[in-house]
Amino acid sequence: MAKKDYYEILGVSREADEREIKKAYKRLAMKYHPDRNQGDKEAEDKFKEIKEAYEILTDAQKRAAYDQYGHAAFEQGGMGGGGGGFGGGADFSDIFGDVFGDIFGGGRRQRAARGADLRYNMDLTLEEAVRGVTKEIRIPTLAECDVCHGSGAKKGSEPITCPTCHGAGQVQMRQGFFTVQQPCPHCHGRGTIIKDPCNKCHGHGRIEKSKTLSVKIPAGVDTGDRIRLAGEGEAGENGAPAGDLYVQVQVKAHPIFEREDNNLFCEVPINFAMAALGGEIEVPTLDGRVNLKIPAETQTGKMFRMRGRGVKSVRGGAQGDLLCRVVVETPVNLNDKQKQLLRELEESFGGPASDKNSPRSKRFFDGVKKFFDDLTR
């Protein structure tokens, strides 16, 4: 089945900048995150699809390859999958160069491959994301063999020059009227072979190993942010540089607050008496409780801004705000006395659409009356 266009998956144009892509990813990731859709296989697949699109389109090199060649750009090297908490990566820098080199005879001795990049998906609470945290993670990886130190050869020996290509890493083959160069089938393009392989890594130069890392998450990170740990990916072949580890941040849904950029939003219920008469209530912030003054005659939906009570930007600068949206709660489970008091209060208003006490209701019912009057003319 044909893969869906990455831009369509995120709902952005092909000209979208990184900020637009990140914003789209955050919105969709929150919607389809497995924590919010437990047991929903379709949502889980959609979440993986969104993550894959985000990882390609926020990497300048991979995005350029995708824009030019589409999904075919990643079919040879394979990209790190989005499943689970851990995934492998690939270096795409030489995919097309190697193809054209083989065709036109421009092949060369294959260099020792840099280690693959790794990805670790880290879930954070909102509090951890806002304040910053240091976490220990354990990752499986390929590490340099501690016996042969990456050479692949038994201790006391060294790799020898390949007798087939004489160290060139390439052999010439005739195809019709053309002579082309291809990687040596004996040494696989390395130019050397291991006659006496290391007993521990069996000539690979690397061994499977788990390692524990301490990762410092800076204050202010958000869903979609990525932290790079240089050299903490898989070990390279034959002493080549190691890849990098990318920690991908995902902030869990919070029971009270919602975050948008550096602002926090929360919904604050008040009873109708306080809405009418005004008063003071305690509202939560990430730094503790603070008092919020409610003016008399406050309506449902009124938004109160508490400056500097939001999230401090991870890149420095001003701190966001906390925006509290008031919701007037209708009382329930009334006793007889309370019901009687409310009836008396309603009578004192002069009906449900009093011009003085309920101007919005008055305007609404006047509009309804005019609407029906116009229909009957």
UniProtKB/Swiss-Prot annotation:
Per UniProt, where does Zn(2+) 1 bind? Answer: C145, C148, C198, C201
The record, for NCBIfam families, names:
DnaJ_bact, PRK10767.1
User: Start and end of every J domain?
Assistant: 5-70
User: Which UniProt keywords are given for this protein, alphabetically ordered?
Assistant: Chaperone, Cytoplasm, DNA replication, Metal-binding, Repeat, Stress response, Zinc, Zinc-finger
Protein name from the UniProt record: Chaperone protein DnaJ
This molecule's function is given as: Participates actively in the response to hyperosmotic and heat shock by preventing the aggregation of stress-denatured proteins and by disaggregating proteins, also in an autonomous, DnaK-independent fashion. Unfolded proteins bind initially to DnaJ; upon interaction with the DnaJ-bound protein, DnaK hydrolyzes its bound ATP, resulting in the formation of a stable complex. GrpE releases ADP from DnaK; ATP binding to DnaK triggers the release of the substrate protein, thus completing the reaction cycle.
Q: How is the cofactor bound?
A: Binds 2 Zn(2+) ions per monomer.
Organism phylogeny: Bacteria, Pseudomonadati, Pseudomonadota, Gammaproteobacteria, Enterobacterales
Q: How does it assemble?
A: Homodimer.
Q: Can you quote the domain comment?
A: The J domain is necessary and sufficient to stimulate DnaK ATPase activity. Zinc center 1 plays an important role in the autonomous, DnaK-independent chaperone activity of DnaJ. Zinc center 2 is essential for interaction with DnaK and for DnaJ activity.
Instruction: Write out the ranges of the repeats annotated as CXXCXGXG motif.
Output: 145-152, 162-169, 184-191, 198-205
Residues reported to bind Zn(2+) 2: C162, C165, C184, C187
Q: Which SUPFAM superfamilies match?
A: Chaperone J-domain, DnaJ/Hsp40 cysteine-rich domain, HSP40/DnaJ peptide-binding domain
Q: Which residues does UniProt assign to the signal peptide?
A: none
**A single GO cellular-component term on record:** cytoplasm
Q: Where in the cell is it found?
A: Cytoplasm
- Identify the coding gene: dnaJ
Zinc finger regions typed CR-type: which residues? Answer: 132-210
